Every structure is written in C-alpha cells, then in structure tokens.
Amino acid sequence: MPEFSDKQIQSHTPMMQQYLRIKAEHADMLLFYRMGDFYELFFEDAKRSAQLLDISLTARGQSNGEPIPMAGVPYHAVENYLARLVNMGESVAICEQIGDPATSKGPVERKVVRIVTPGTVTDESLLAEKRQNLLVAICPLNPKQPEAEYAISSLELSSGRFWLTKAHSSEQLAAEMQRLEPAELLYPESISLAGLPLAKAKCKRRPAWEFEQQTAFMLLTRQFGTQHLEGFGIKNNEPTLAAAGAILHYVKETQRAALPHIQALITEHPQDAIILDAATRRNLELQQSMGEGDTHLSAVLDKTVSAMGSRQFQRWLQRPIRNHQELNQRYDAVDALKENLNFENIQLTLKQLADIERIVARVGLRSARPKDFARLRDSLAKIPEVRASLSHRSLSYLHDIIEPFPEVVDLLTKAVIEQPPLLIRDGGVIAEGYDKELDELRDLATGATDYLKQLEQRERERSGIATLKVGYNRVHGYFIEVSRQSSEAVPDDYQRRQTLKNTERYIIPELKEHEDKVLNAQARSLAREKWLYDQLFEHLLPQVTALQKSASGLAQLDTLCCFARLADNYRYCRPQLQKETSLIELEAARHPVIEQLSDEPFIANPMSLTPQQRMLMITGPNMGGKSTYMRQAALIVILAHMGCYVPADKAIIGDIDRIFTRIGASDDLASGRSTFMVEMTETANILHNATAKSLVLMDEIGRGTSTYDGLSLAWSCADYLSRQLQCLTLFATHYFELTELAEELPATVNVHVDAKEHGDTIAFLHKVSPGAASQSFGLQVAKLAGVPEHVIHKAKQKLSELEHTHHGGLNEPKQATMELTPPPEAIPSHTEKRNPLLDELEQLDINDLTPKQALDILYQWQQKQKGSTQS
C-alpha cells in the first residue's frame, strides 16, 4: 500500500482519512475495517485478500484520481475467513465501530480491538485441536557472535504455557525449531534465519529494543506480580530472558487485553531430556512421515481420546525426559491403569470432555463465547466421576491435581441456558431466573403477545376488516396489515408504513407507542445480559490457575491411559531404567509402527549394547530389515523416556543423553547440497557432538562417493566412534570389509540379517543373528525390483568372471548365484583389434553395480593391465 503524507490524507473523504490513519499503524498486516454488516479492505489489502480468499474485488471512491480497490467479507462469517488467512500465515487487525452512529458527527469512531496472527490465535475455529500452536522468539546471547548461543522462548497462548531454554549452537537451534514447529517466529533484525527448518513458520523481524534484557525483566515481573524471578528458578540477570520478554511484548501488543492465564515461566534445561537433532526427528519419523500417509510414530501410537491428551502426547514425544523418578511415576500410573482395564472406563469419560485447557485460556483473555461456558460447565460436572477412578496410590498425584469445581458448575448451571447461541450479541444466553431485572425486561419485551392479540381484535372490529393482522419485522417494526382491496376501509388515523404487491401496512399511534416500549425494553434487556455475561468472567478469573492445573492433570491422565492401552493391546513391557551406565538390552524387541501397520506377523529380535559390546556391525541384504532393526532400538528408547511401556518382552535401558541418526540419502536442492554433502554434514555433527552416553545409528556411510573414498570414510568413522567416543553404535553397511573391524576394534561385534534363497527367489527372514552375512543377494534384490532380465543376465556373467579371477584383496562374501536363461539378443562383435578392457567397459552398466562390485572390477582391470604391460 502506498504511503500517504498528511496533506494527501486530507484529500480523501473523512471515512477514508480515518481508515488511512488506522492502517498506517498496522502497515504489515491486513486491516479488516468494520462498515455496517461487512469488514471492508482497501488498496493493496483488498487486492491481496481477493486473491487469497477468492472474493470479489470492486472499487469505492478515488485516490489520486484512481479508483480505490475494495473487497469485503460479511461480519457474521468473519471467523471462517480469518481461519483461512491464518492457515496461509497472514496476520489480520480487526477494526470495530465503537461509537454510536446515531450520535456521531462524521465517521463513526473506530479502533483496532484485536490482532490475529498465526502464533497468537485462540479461537477454536482457528486452531488445530490436536496440535500445539506456538509463538517462538529467538535471539543470540552474544550479538558479536550471533551463531554461538541462542535464547529460545515459546508460548502457547491458547493454554498459557510459557517456556524458556537455550541452544548452545546453530545445530541445537535447528533441532529446537524442528521440535517446536513454531506457527510464528519472532527474531531481532540483526540476525539471519538461513538454514533453519522454518518452512511452516511465519517469521517476523522485530526491533532490537524488544529483545533487551532489562525490558524483559520489567515486563515479566509486572506480568507475574513479583519483584524478581528467582521463584521460577531464573536469575534476575539471566540473558535468556530477552527472548521471553520479546514474546510477552508481542502478545500484549496483539491481544490488547490482560493475560491472567500466563502465570509462570518454565525453564527447560537441555540436559534434562534426550536431545534429538533435526535429522534424527526426521529420520525416525516421530511426527511426520517421510513417505505418503500418516505412518509416523505419533499417528500410529496416539490412542488418546481428548484434544488435551493428544497435545500432551506430542509434548512428551517431542521432549523425552531423563528424570528416572518422574519416569517411574509414569510407569507406576500405567501399571495401575492396566489393572482391571481401568483405562477403558476413564477414557470413556474423558472422551466426553471439552477442551478445558483452551476454554480456560479464552476465559483469561475474556474472549470465551457462550458455548465455551456451557461446555466448561458440562465438562467440570464430570470431574468427580474421573476422580473416583483414581483411588490407586500410584494415581494419587493425579487425584490431587484434578480438582472438582462445584461452585463453578453451580454458577454456570444457574447463569447459562443448556444450549446457548453462538454469540452474546444474539441474546438469549443468560438463563431465566438468574437475574430478576433481566427477567422483568424480557417480560416487557416479549410478554406483550396478549396485548397485540387484543389490539388486533379491536382494530378488526373498529375497521370492519376481518382479515386485518398485526405483525412485526426487524426492518419496519410493528405494523397493521390489510389486503389491497380492504385498504380503502381503514380508519383515518392509519399511517401507511409499507406497500407490498397485494397488501398495505400501516402504523397507528397506539401501536407506535407500544413499539417504542418494546424496542427500548429489548435494548435494555440485551445490555443487561451483556453486563451479566461480563460478570461471569469476573467470577471465573480467580479460578483460572486452578482450572489450568486440573486441565493439565486431565491431559496427563489421558496420555497415561493411552500408554496403558498400548501396553495391554500390544504386549508392551515396563522398561527397567539404570543410571549407572549406558546400555540397551532388549529381548524380543519390535518396531512399534511396523508391528501395527504390517499385515504379516512382525519378527521380534534381541539387541545388546553394553560397555563390553558397544558397537554392532550390521550386514545383510537390502530389504532384509537392517534399518528397521536400528530404528526400533531408537524408538524404544524414546518411548521409555516418554513414560510409556515398550514393544519388547524385556527392556533394560541405561543412561542415554542423545540419539543421532545418519539414515537415508537425498539431495538438499534448496541449499545446493548434494546427497554426499548432506550425508557428510550429518556425520560431522555426530562425530563432533556424540558422547559416551549417546546412541548413534549409522546406515550406509560413504555410499554417496567413490568406492575407495566411501569405504575409507566408513572405516574411519566406525573406528572413531568405537575408540574415541565409545558411544552405543548401530552401524549398518554393505561394505563387507568393515566386518573385519570386529577383530580390530574394542567392544565391536558382527550381526547380520538372515535371508534364504529358493530357486530364483529370495526370502527375507528379518531375523538378526550373530556374525557377518554370508551373501549379499544383490542380484536377487535387483530382480525383485524389476530390473530387466537381460541386465540381470549380464550382471550374472560379469559376477561369474569376477569370482573366478579374484586375486586376494579384502575379503567379501560371494554373491548368491541364480540360474538365468541367456537373452536372445546377440552381443555385437568388433572386427578391429583393440584393448579388450574397452569392450568390457562398453558392456558394463554402472547403474546396476554395487560399490563393492565396482571396486572388484577396477581391481581386476588393474591386474589385467599390469599383466599385459609386463608381457
């Protein structure tokens, strides 16, 4: 939108002058400007909204001799349009008429009453019920070294949860962004966001002064009503406060209301949870599938029945904790909920509850709607039923958190009708009998039916018109209606109010006097009802903290019931946690997602990673199950640190601080990085940041480059992980030379995934056994994948040659053989004499070679060339 000087603004109509001044204060967002029954948009806002919302673009008046573009949406449907805009990442300022048109001279007074942004929405229609909607702020702790350390703060305005943490590197910052998935991100104008996974976030540059520590301290202490922040475990001079202060400033600016539901700031220390970097979260498919469909862990294992419970499940999944005392408390609760299928009855009740957490937040913001009050009342009425199921001592802490609120239930039962309308402006929300004055006004406004019937009968007799009727509509008010034929017989005091095709409508002084009384009573009745509605907020605000606490308890209970259901339905076992050492010992472990989605019975496998056996070198064919075996170990560790039972017959898990994965291969085209560059970047991150307490998953390291380079890198990485870092490592490879490391490296053991050959086919047993694989089955897998028969045949011929002429070198198991019929096509002959190696090179299909086959061919050619040179 073009900027206007004061002189240019003066050249517009008074209404447009008002619009331009308000728009200048909200230049970076769409302005919904209330005009009667519509919210209108002008200039560039109109063009943009017409494109985004597919609404008509018209014009109104002129500016600098050009028509002013205009678009609009009806006020009664505004929430639907807001939802669409927010989902597109747009921010909208809502400008309402606050003056009385009847008494206004010039334009009706207007002002922006709220600002809707992707990270600050609280309306039910604008939120995904099972996902957190986070506003996040970041800032460097040292402006001179902007990539050293970062303060990170996040706020879920729809619940009041407010967190503060720190990232010690740009890699940790990227991991936090992957974990939090912010709907909106605030950052100081002094830094760049390049390289962060923020595709879904609306990023907003903010002035540097909003990130000043002293400003933050003042805002936070004022919000919490304290003189310092030590009660929250935060030092008054804590540098990370800057990010929290920026969030609070932004929310106050957008909401333009008190924030009583934001009661505390929680500090999260990275060392208190298992750290999962961005690549690990992606590779393990915790909350997003890498393929099609909802096959990620969250989609498959989330058996909660309430929106609150589902969001709690996500929070525990995003941040698996290391506090064994708290984890064992959750295990105990799951065990108690499993008894007599107690979770079944509890979840039947929880399923009937509304989203108390978000309703309470709207109460705090004074934006709750009549239906919110009704659903809060009905949900709180069921809490005693829930608490009655929590008598077991392992559930007593939840019993104490989840309080009953009989006074609130009683208040809302008396005050709000059973099924109230959507908005208070429609009236009819406050129940009859709650307020004597309101009842009297309603009687005056609606209790005159008998009077109108009597008036109608009198006027029929007075006029002699038997079909005369007394009626009412919202446009013309009360009227007396007669047919066109009878209009000549009306008395002289009848004043025509409206002419229709076949009827005439009139008003008389007596009816006009009644209309004034009724309309006045209706206006007073609605005003009284709105006042009473506001008083409900005053009654409920002191209960907000306790209500939030109970809502949190209900969310935890639902998630624990989900864990109990998983344990009961799928034979999960209780993990045994050990603090003394880092280890993972599993008996009959399964992959929690594949087990549920596969039509075939899942083959369980053991795993042992201990101080005496820290690295497993895993070999076997593609599709054999190596990646599944590795991933299920990581997922079991994560589930155990959520407080969930795990898919195994027995699980002993030691102290794990981080999980790393180097799995899969793909280009990062957006950043201009090749497959190999992505692979090496992730590998470097592991080698720099893994500790002796870390679990590392390495799959096919080195395959993105030449055979010698790849083998050398894989060998060296395995050596470093084993000798230097001494972390728990699962190392899958097709370089069979690496199996020799079991004899060279300490605490390294070979295991393999079994497969059996049946004629021309291969059966994958998915069973993990000790020792290195005996065959690689590369040609059989290629055939299963649909590689053309003549290509398989050529590969078979070349493999046979290589196996007969192999001289020394590193040891590799032979390829399994297949009896294949030669294709009918003849190989063209060359009459001219030339180096036979060139013939072999022309016939070679490099796309169908494994790295090891390529290495062997190169070796063989080298030997042939040396022999021919010597002769």
Swiss-Prot record:
Instruction: State the Gene Ontology terms under molecular function.
Output: ATP binding; ATP-dependent DNA damage sensor activity; damaged DNA binding; mismatched DNA binding
Q: Which residue ranges does the record annotate as region Disordered?
A: 806-837
CDD domains, sorted: ABC_MutS1
Q: SUPFAM superfamilies per the record?
A: DNA repair protein MutS, domain I, DNA repair protein MutS, domain II, DNA repair protein MutS, domain III, P-loop containing nucleoside triphosphate hydrolases
Q: Name one GO cellular component term.
A: cytosol
UniProt KW keywords: ATP-binding, DNA damage, DNA repair, DNA-binding, Nucleotide-binding
- What's one GO BP annotation on this UniProt entry? mismatch repair
- Keyword Nucleotide-binding set for record: yes
The residues the record assigns to binding ATP are G620, P621, N622, M623, G624, G625, K626, S627
SMART domains, A to Z:
MUTSac, MUTSd
The role this protein plays is: This protein is involved in the repair of mismatches in DNA. It is possible that it carries out the mismatch recognition step. This protein has a weak ATPase activity.
HAMAP family with a match to the protein in the record: MutS
Protein family membership: Belongs to the DNA mismatch repair MutS family.
Spell out the protein name for this chain. DNA mismatch repair protein MutS
Source organism (scientific name) = Idiomarina loihiensis (strain ATCC BAA-735 / DSM 15497 / L2-TR)
The upper taxonomy is: Bacteria, Pseudomonadati, Pseudomonadota, Gammaproteobacteria, Alteromonadales
